[in-house]
Amino acid sequence: MLKTLTLILSCLTLSAFSQEINKDVKHFTRIVASPRINVILEKGDHEAVRLTYSNVGAEQINIDVTGKTLRIYLEDARKVERMKRQRDGHGNRESVYHNAVITAYVTYKELDMLEIRGNQELTCKDPLEAETFTLRAYGENEIHLASLRTGFFKAKLYGENDLRIDKGRTLEQKFMLYGENKIDTKGLRSDYIITSIFGEGSLMINSAEEVRIDAFGEPRIYVDGGANINKRLVIGKANIFAN
């Protein structure tokens, strides 16, 4: 919530200086958003990217499709941000893009994979439907999906990400979580869920048949739906609550 408020205030403050890029792109089914790129997904019949930005040059912004993957990234920050030494006499370092405010409005026709890196937001208010759907997040991102329908949902999160899926249906979910991630997919009804958790995050899920748990650390797991809880390899203090 704090990140959302900060982003809104930043956008309002810098609105007079904000610039825009509009670009039609080739067909894609996957999106990779690199550090500093906030993403808002919109379903449509014409694939395109509308990007608003400030405190960064247009020549430093890259939008391209390779194969079926749309990549949006800043120069020299494809996977991680390039750092520079501050002139504060203490040797501290900061991102070369620390003042950049960037939001990509991406119109998609179909999606089966999302990847986000850094410390930003990814939002999709329209339905996502795919045979299989993969989500990967690295850093401290806020991810909100309104609706997901898929046969198999796989999520791999590293860091302190916050994932929420409001509703949907899937046969099976598989989570691999590293760090203190916060997951709320209790609105996504599933039959089977497999979890591998390393750290102290929280997981709120909904399963009708079985939840398999491997956990290392002290995660909190809340299970709705009446599934059988199968503790496989649990090292540490996993707090499991079943409704």
What residues fall within each predicted segment?
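Bacterial Sec-dependent N-terminal signal peptides
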Residues: 1-23
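Glycine-centered small-residue hotspots that permit tight backbone geometry or close packing
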Residues: 5, 118, 234-238
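Acidic (Asp/Glu) and glycine-rich low-complexity loops/linkers
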Residues: 19-117, 121-136, 147-156, 166-173, ...
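Short, surface-exposed interaction patches in beta-rich subdomains
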Residues: 163-243
